[in-house]
């Protein structure tokens, strides 16, 4: 378990370095982020990870992204898009995917992911989420209706 947590933490080194270099977070804040993510990841790696563990991790990543966006605006951080501009949203999507692999039958979790895709403007992830949700919940009229509306409005595809 410790090896897999260490691997996850090592994978985030480039994005954390980029966030520090761009000025989103200080070195001390990066240490706190790493410690918090490590604690959350240990909870997810347990034999019986709970739904609330995944939701807690997702909420932490969402709040971290809100803080990053706020600081970008406040500090007038500009320049070319880099790893730090997308890594937290990508990590949040991965957490949703891991959670929904384990809790496939919970329709409210699928709705949460779909809403996150919409709010983060993640079109590819939205397609993926809607497709998987429709496959696993073929009798859910709400998902089919939302998928049809999204396909029509965002992809301009009426068929």
Question: Where are the model-predicted features located?
Answer:
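Alpha-helical solenoid scaffolds in eukaryotic macromolecular assemblies
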Residues: 1-159
């Amino acid at each position: 378990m410790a090896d897999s947590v260490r691997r996850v933490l090592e994978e985030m080194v480039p994005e954390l370095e980029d966030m520090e270099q761009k000025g989103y977070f200080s070195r001390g804040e990066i240490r706190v982020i790493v410690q918090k993510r490590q604690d959350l990841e240990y909870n997810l790696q347990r034999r019986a990870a709970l739904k609330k563990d995944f939701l807690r991790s997702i909420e932490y990543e969402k709040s971290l992204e809100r803080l990053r966006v706020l600081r970008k605006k406040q500090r007038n951080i500009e320049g070319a898009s880099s790893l730090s501009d997308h890594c937290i949203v990508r990590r949040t999507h991965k957490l949703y995917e891991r959670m929904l692999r384990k809790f496939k039958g919970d329709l409210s979790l699928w709705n949460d992911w779909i809403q996150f895709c919409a709010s983060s403007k993640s079109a590819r992830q939205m397609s993926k989420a809607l497709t998987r949700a429709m496959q696993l919940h073929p009798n859910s009229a709400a998902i089919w209706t939302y998928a049809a509306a999204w396909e029509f409005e965002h992809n301009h595809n009426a068929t």
